[in-house]
Curated annotation (Swiss-Prot):
It catalyses: Transfers a segment of a (1->4)-alpha-D-glucan chain to a primary hydroxy group in a similar glucan chain. It comes from Cupriavidus pinatubonensis (strain JMP 134 / LMG 1197) (Cupriavidus necator (strain JMP 134)). The gene is glgB. CDD domains: AmyAc_Glg_BE, E_set_GBE_prok_N. This is 1,4-alpha-glucan branching enzyme GlgB. It comes from the Bacteria. Gene3D superfamilies: Glycosidases, Golgi alpha-mannosidase II, Immunoglobulins. Keywords: Carbohydrate metabolism, Glycogen biosynthesis, Glycogen metabolism, Glycosyltransferase, Transferase. Belongs to the glycosyl hydrolase 13 family. GlgB subfamily. NCBIfam families: branching_enzym (TIGR01515), PRK05402.1 (NF003811), PRK12313.1 (NF008967).
Length: 750
């Protein structure tokens, strides 16, 4: 075994005081390597070991054969012995009171574990492989297999690793502090029980020698299923055996796609309540792979967006209060099963986006809160570090190590799990120091302003690093204010996201949808205002989980009128949305037209598919996705004003909207979309179009197959050379009640 010898010579042979021995067995000694392990004494090595509960300990050779006895130094389990001259490689042969024995290499015989470059990058916040550096790493060190534990806790007086392998006794495995990085490290051989599958935590003393709650590993790659809170040793990464990726073709093609010109239709999913049978730590991801992936494929969505799957203690947070930012929740299975789920999505042509939460974290005592007895990950001042709305703590993004922890965590999902994008949660709460705070409850930035400059710098760095290291991966911001340049490049002063949720469009149009049709004439602008700023950012139109909880009502319940009008209004609204500029997002259950709000403790009301009206909405969503993907006009120029033109935007008396969608020049036909948001059919309604000839009725939300009255235009209309609405030609349409009709011009490309 090769060792790096770092102990000062004068420390090796002096007598160990009773006070130091007592501190060692009580788990209070700050420098265990100064006492434990091999220490040179002339031509031989003195070895000390702390093995509480042992009957006896002997020094053994590499085969486990006894070399020399060890005698007790302290009743708490400290033993000492001398190796024969010329012998430096040894093992500890421990006999327990129950008659069993254990032979293992000594954790305190190994030299420094982490390299100086690793520690330097950690301190700079630029170690982008942090998940393979800190935490519990299944490694071979000097020919010995075991687990290398490392944790950042610069202000702790002592850190021990505790777990299944040592009876959860802090005195067994105190760790070495690496100055000045504040990282503690220790290698525990497999022969001592440290191996994949074993549970562990860190036991810490704060700067004043006070005991802290046992802490889960911030860099854990796997965890116990809640309510249990321990971290779990796992294989090094999912990119290594036993999992083999089969999505090379997907990853290659993804990197070549222009996300702004491509269709992007997202099905947002809370996995625990999509199907209750998936809540199985043994095979949850397998169940979802068998059920969710074919379902999404049938409906034609391009991507699945998962509410946070990072491990979180409280299920009622829906994942938005995570503690283990590197571990997929154990509620659904091990990390390899999650990787297999993503791999299968890719092989079926479906991308995967994860909701990711870098804004805040919960106060659970086993988590990041006052991790080493100080405000390590959070701000010390509660005006900066405590979020009053959610009773959570706010990351201190001005600290290099915290920023690096989050950056590496984002890359962990993109690089090691092949995730296709991150939807960053609660960006607005990060950008403003006074977000949801009273005037005297926030701290201005160094210029006296309300902008959180550290958060701005972090988000720019996040997007820059993601786009440099993960070509084709998307970043999407949930940002609810008018912060400028969210999707502008970081180099030009923007934040650098690929897309931003259009919360304004969502709020305006849902408010309009909830009105009785007789009142809609006075709120016409709610449906048109979105196009005033539609190209100021690259937008996703989100009908998310937040809009169907907390008394807001399901999508169907938002619609006024009798049952027929509710279904018709919802179908018309979906048609309006899919034909409107912007990428699409629909939360699960919206395609079923559920009556009830989303309940995270239940599952979707799948029995609704046995009812024709609900099945009709389901079929409509499928057909909208198919048409959206087929027609370039509906997606290619989503983020350019050249792709959109109002034809009828001011008919508030009839609540009719009509607009043209155009593709990139030469790539497809012009599309006309018309929405009638009253229950009154409109016959002979003239609408201007840019070209004469045949306009095919590609989709009518009032079709009988969707549960409608089947009023329409017989599949096609012919444009006449009658100018109207500033266009050279026009069509006379029958507008069904509460319906959207989408027509495609035949033969003349944009």
């Amino acid at each position: 075994m090769n060792r790096v010898d770092t102990r000062p010579p004068e420390r090796r042979t002096q007598t160990i005081s009773d006070g130091e021995l007592g501190a060692l067995v009580e788990g209070r000694h700050r420098d265990p390597f100064a006492i434990l392990g091999p220490h040179r004494d002339g031509d031989t090595l003195i070895v000390r070991a702390c093995v509480p509960g042992a009957h006896s300990v002997m020094l053994a050779d590499s085969r486990g054969e006894p070399l020399a006895p060890m005698t007790p130094l302290h009743a708490g389990g400290v033993f000492t012995g001398r190796l024969p001259a010329g012998v430096s490689v040894y093992q500890l042969l421990v006999r327990w009171h129950n008659g069993t024995q254990q032979v293992s290499h000594d954790p305190y015989a190994f030299g420094l574990l982490l390299g100086e470059l690793d520690l330097h990058l950690i301190a700079e916040g630029r170690h982008f492989e942090l998940g393979a550096c800190l935490g519990a790493q299944w490694r071979n060190v000097d020919g010995v297999q075991g687990v290398r534990f490392a944790v950042w806790a610069p202000n702790a007086r002592r850190v021990s690793v505790i777990g299944d392998f040592n009876g959860w006794q802090p005195a067994r495995h105190p760790m070495r502090l690496r100055h000045p990085s504040g990282v503690w490290e220790l290698f525990i051989p497999e022969a001592m029980g440290a191996r994949p599958g074993c549970r562990y935590k860190f036991d810490l003393l704060d700067p004043h020698d006070a005991q802290l709650p046992d802490k889960a590993d911030p860099l854990a790659l796997a965890t116990e299923a809640p309510p249990a809170t321990a971290s779990v040793v796992t294989q090094p990464q999912v990119s290594a055996p036993p999992f083999a990726w089969q999505d090379d073709e997907w990853m290659r093609l993804r990197n070549a796609v222009d996300p702004y010109a491509a269709p992007l239709s997202i099905y947002e999913v809370h996995v625990g309540s999509w199907l209750r049978a998936a809540n199985d730590p043994a095979r949850g991801w397998e169940v979802l792979a068998d059920r969710l992936i074919p379902y999404v494929h049938e409906l034609g969505f391009t991507h699945i967006e998962l509410l946070p799957v990072t491990e979180h203690p409280f299920g009622g947070s829906w994942g938005y209060q995570p503690l283990s930012l590197y571990a997929p929740t154990a509620r659904l299975g091990p990390p390899q099963a999650f990787a297999a789920f993503i791999d299968r999505c890719h092989r079926d042509g479906i991308g995967v986006i994860l909701d990711w939460v870098p804004a805040h974290f919960p106060t659970d005592p086993h988590g990041l809160a006052r991790f080493d007895g100080t405000a390590l990950y959070e701000h010390e001042d509660p005006r900066e570090g405590f979020h009053q709305d959610w009773n959570t703590l706010i990351y201190n993004l001005g600290r290099n190590e915290v920023r690096g922890f989050l950056l590496a965590g984002a890359l962990h999902w993109l690089e090691h799990f092949h995730v296709d994008g991150l939807r960053v949660d609660a960006v607005a709460s990060m950008l403003y120091r006074d977000y949801s705070r009273a005037p005297d409850q926030w701290v201005p930035n160094r210029f006296g302003g309300r902008e959180n400059l550290e958060a701005v710098a972090f988000l720019r760095e996040l997007n820059t690093v993601v786009h440099e290291r993960c070509p084709g991966a998307l970043t999407i911001a949930e940002e609810s204010t008018a912060w400028p340049g969210v999707t502008a490049s970081a180099a030009s002063g923007g934040l650098g996201f690929d897309f931003k949720w259009n919360m304004g469009w969502m709020h305006d149009t849902l408010r309009y949808l909830s009105l009785d049709p007789i009142h809609r004439a006075w709120h016409h602008q709610d449906m048109t205002f979105g196009t005033v700023y539609a190209w100021s950012e690259a937008f996703v139109l989100p009908l998310s989980h937040d809009e169907v909880v907390h008394g807001k009502g399901s999508m169907l319940r938002k619609c006024p009128g009798d049952d027929w009008q509710r279904f018709a209004g919802l179908r018309a609204y979906y048609g309006f949305m899919w034909a409107h500029p912007g990428k699409k997002l629909l939360f699960m259950g919206g395609e079923l037209a559920q009556w009830q709000e989303w309940n995270h403790d239940a599952e979707l009301d799948w029995a609704l598919l046995d009812h024709p009206m609900h099945r009709g909405v389901h079929t409509l969503v499928r057909d909208l996705n198919a048409l959206y993907r087929e027609l370039p006009a509906l997606h290619e120029l989503d983020h350019s004003p050249a792709g959109f033109q109002w034809v009828v935007g001011d008919d508030h008396q009839n609540s009719v909207f009509a607009w043209l969608r155009r593709p990139a020049p030469g790539s497809g036909d012009v599309v006309l979309a018309v929405t009638n948001m009253t229950p009154v059919p409109r016959y002979g309604y003239r609408i201007g179009v840019p070209s004469e000839g045949c306009w095919h009725e590609r989709l009518n939300t009032d079709a009988a197959c969707y549960g409608g009255s089947n009023l329409g235009n017989g599949g096609a209309v012919t444009a006449e050379p009658v100018p109207s609405h500033g266009q050279e030609a026009s069509v006379l349409l029958t507008l069904p009640p509460l319906a959207t009709v989408i027509l495609q011009h035949a033969g003349t490309q944009a």
